[in-house]
Structures are given as C-alpha cells and as structure tokens.
C-alpha cells in the first residue's frame, strides 16, 4: 500500500463488501464472443496485468468495479513507487496506469462482477445480468482492511486515520499517533511508527495480546510506545484540519477519557475480497487465494495477483509486479492450452 492508502475499498475491485452475497442471476444474456482473458479488479495489479496482456495482443477485458482504481483512488500522496521522485497522487497514478494499459488494447468497464462459473471452460463471468465467456481469468480484487466503524471515523479516512503505517507513517513526524489492535500487525505498526512519531499509544481492548512474544516485547520495550489495555475507541474527534484525538472507553467499567492525537492507525486485520468466486478457488484459512503454479490458482486458467493473494507485502509496487507475472503466465497458458 502506498502513501495514504488507507481506504481498503478494494485493491482492485468491486464496490461490494466481501460479506455481500453474490446475486444469483435468474435471467442472463450471453455474449457469444469468447475472450482470451478477463481481468476482475483494477488497481496496480489489474492495470499492470492489463498492460502486459494488451501488449501480448490478448485483447483483455477488465471489469474494474464502480470504484475503478481501487484504494489508490483515495490516496493523497504516493512517495514509495519507483519513478516518481517528487511523489504522485493516487488518482493521478491510477489514471496514468489505466491510460497506458488502454493504449495497448485493454478494454475497461467500470462495472462489478456478480459471480463466476469456473466449472467448465470457457469460464462464465456474470456482470449485471450479462454473462461473458473467457478462456482465462486474472483476479485482482484485493483485500479490504477491517475498520472500527466508530462515530466520526468515515469523515477522517484520509485526514488522519489510516490502516497502513508503512505507507503513511512519514506524514506524522514528531506527532502523537494511536495504533489500535492487539496482534502482530498492531505491534509491528506501532514499532515502525516510532521512526517518525514523537509518541505512539497502542490501544487494545484486552490485556492479552495475540501478537507473538517477540513482536509484543519489541513494542513494549520501546520507550516511545505507551500501551493502554482494556480500552477501545468510542468516538473519533476532529476539527476542520483533521483528526484531533479520540474518546476511549474502558472495557471493564465503561468509563471514558479523551486522548489527543493527530494520527491513528487501525490494525485489526484484513479480509480478501473473494466472495464472488463462490468457493470455487482454493484459499487459505484466512480467505486469501492460494497460488498453485506461479500465479495460477487451484483452477487451471484462473490466475490471481495483488492483495487478494499477498499476505505479506501489500505494497503497490509488489501488486504491480504480480500483475505483470500473472499476465505473462496467462499468455503462456493460453499458448499451451487454447491457441
């Protein structure tokens, strides 16, 4: 995730939450043309896959979703993507990636995929009552961060509340920031933020952390980190300039207190966006798609790239690289199995 990539709308994707059941289609119209490849999702993984597939003359079709460009469309500054020494805005980068891919033949539709049928080839991709046929699919739908949904949170996404310290920590130099969570991610984010922030307060609703011992001790022993247990966010506070703090609630007795902070990082987990696949592709215990051979999934002809697969890096540059790999894998697979 790049700078201020804090809205896990969907790194690729669909405007629907992963918890939204896929709609069954009682009446669909079939497109007679069988596409070489359909890319589901956009973002850096999807657009890069589209660029490479287009250059390979595969005539790729992308369903980018209503939030075309994914989370980066709500990213103010990207400073860690090579080639932009002065940084670049997220929407601008996504526009450039899209235009570049379209120049080489990517066809983009800003519509959501409802469901897919992978039981036989050609595969069926259903979009708002239309079913498209394709020899192969690249899934680039990403993963969405879990949010607290506390009062005042929606207004401060992008103005101080983030889900990626690696991306956004540098914006809070010499400031006080909060980290909410109790796992490895929360402890790692808190420790990372001490590089920039003057103080980091780690807030957890229990006194037992799910984090590994080494990650917890690293945070607990850092002089710039204060750990507050049995606390949860009741409400976010802000003014016209952005986040100013939060109201903390004691999970034991219900008492409240106000804490001042200009930044906050929510680290309570992610969920990959794979519901539309209907369980037809193998995933791990957390729902992330599993690669079986290079970027191919458990279903031959179905490939995946970006945060829908990535459980470790979650960066725009790694998503783009995986999108490139997926397109090359698709080209080779089509040569061997279809053309």
Language-model segment annotations:
Residues 34-36, 110, 173-175, 230, ...:
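Phosphate-coordination loops involved in phosphoryl transfer and adenosine-cofactor binding
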Residues 1-3:
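Cysteine-centered motifs
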Residues 101-127, 131-134, 195-292, 332-339:
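A Rossmann-like FAD-binding core segment of flavoenzymes
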Residues 23, 29-30, 35-104, 175, ...:
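Beta1-alpha1 glycine-rich phosphate/pyrophosphate-binding loop at the start
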Residues 144, 149, 155-171, 267-318, ...:
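FAD-site-proximal beta/loop scaffold in flavoenzymes
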Residues 43-44, 67, 143-145, 184-185, ...:
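Residue-level detector of alpha-helix initiation sites
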């Amino acid at each position: 995730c790049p700078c201020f990539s804090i809205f896990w709308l969907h790194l690729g994707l669909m405007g629907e939450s992963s918890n939204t059941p896929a709609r069954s289609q009682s009446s669909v119209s079939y497109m007679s043309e069988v596409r070489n490849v359909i890319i589901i999702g956009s973002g850096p993984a999807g657009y890069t896959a589209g660029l490479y597939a287009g250059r390979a003359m595969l005539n790729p079709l992308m369903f980018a979703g209503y939030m075309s460009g994914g989370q980066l469309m709500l990213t103010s500054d990207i400073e860690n993507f090579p080639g932009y020494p002065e940084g670049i805005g997220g929407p601008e980068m996504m526009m450039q990636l899209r235009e570049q891919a379209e120049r080489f033949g990517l066809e983009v539709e800003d519509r959501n995929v409802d469901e897919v049928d992978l039981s036989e080839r050609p595969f069926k991709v259903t979009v708002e009552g239309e079913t498209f046929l394709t020899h192969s699919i690249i899934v680039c739908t990403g993963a969405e961060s879990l949010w607290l949904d506390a009062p005042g949170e929606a207004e401060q996404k992008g103005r101080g509340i983030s889900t990626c310290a690696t991306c956004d920590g540098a914006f809070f130099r010499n400031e006080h920031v909060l980290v909410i969570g109790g796992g490895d991610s929360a402890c790692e984010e808190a420790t990372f933020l001490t590089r920039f922030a003057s103080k980091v307060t780690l807030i957890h609703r229990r006194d037992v952390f799910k984090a590994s011992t080494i990650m917890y001790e690293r945070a607990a022993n850092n002089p710039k980190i204060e750990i507050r247990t049995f606390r949860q966010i009741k409400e976010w506070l802000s003014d016209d300039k952005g986040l100013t703090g939060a109201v903390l609630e004691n999970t034991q007795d219900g008492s409240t207190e106000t804490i001042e902070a200009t930044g906050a990082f929510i680290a309570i987990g992610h969920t990959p966006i794979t519901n539309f696949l209907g369980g037809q592709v193998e995933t791990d215990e957390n729902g992330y798609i599993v690669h079986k051979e290079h970027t191919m999934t458990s279903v031959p002809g179905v490939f995946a790239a970006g945060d829908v697969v990535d459980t470790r890096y979650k960066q725009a540059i790694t998503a783009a690289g995986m999108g490139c790999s997926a397109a090359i894998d698709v080209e080779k697979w089509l040569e061997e199995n279809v053309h």
